[in-house]
Amino acid sequence: AKQIKLLGLSGTYVQMLTENIPNFRTVAAPFGLGYVPGPWMQSIQVSKGITSVKQGYEAMTGQINIEYRKPQMLEADWINLNVYTNSKGRIEGNADATLKMKDNRWGTTLLVHYDKDLSTHDENNDGFQDMPKTEQVNVMNRWTFLSDTYEFQIGARYLNENRHSGQLESSIVNPYLINLETNRIEGFMKNGFMWNDARESSLALILSGSYH
């Protein structure tokens, strides 16, 4: 699992946020960063030490916030494709499409990711896989609306991942195997109201939910 340690601790002691919304809690915490494809990221912010409880109480040693690509980005392409492979037998494919409408006030982005490990690794020849073989499908769609006094965002995401590890099946008759299948659905909505007579004043309503 991909984790970042802050002040020597990881897991539940580090709060994971996506666009300032608490995410990847409980059973999703060990694999949180693995659920975020790199090409989807617009930016990442890391805060070390105890932070504000504005987004929750979990940030004991730090906080990691990930910002996804947004339709209003100046560099947002209409469509972007990315393919990656390496000598260890890993393949990845990424695609994102952006559509801007009505003077760039309305916009939508579709993000798609797929990766798979084709090879089994046992470099020390102990009969156990050195790392799990994974296959992941990740799809996200978001809509945004921006005006002078109101901002609105809504999005949904689906993830399916399979992890296989344990003993090599060719090395023993009844091998010890580990199979972990994850199905995760997320949804979020963000509303922001700003007043013309006091730009420093605003009101926000943020809703989110997930099924894992």
Task: Show the residue positions of the predicted features.
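Flexible, glycine/serine/threonine-rich loop segments and coil->beta-strand junctions
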Residues: A1-M41, K48-N65, M73-A76
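Hydrophobic, lipid-facing positions within transmembrane beta-strands of outer-membrane proteins
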Residues: K2, T12, M60-G62, D77-I79, ...
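Transmembrane beta-barrel domains of outer membrane proteins
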Residues: L7, S47, E67, D96-K100, ...
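Outer-envelope beta-barrel architecture signal
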Residues: V14, E75-I79, I91, K102-T108, ...
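Short strand-turn segments of transmembrane beta-barrel domains in outer membranes
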Residues: S43-Q45, T51-Q55, Q63, Y68-K100, ...
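Membrane-embedded beta-strand positions of outer-membrane beta-barrel proteins
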Residues: I44, I79-V83, T108-V112, N141, ...
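Outer-membrane beta-barrel pore domains and translocons
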Residues: G49, E67, N82-K88, K100, ...
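Flexible loop and strand-edge segments within Gram-negative outer membrane beta-barrel domains
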Residues: D117-N138, L146-S201, G209-H212
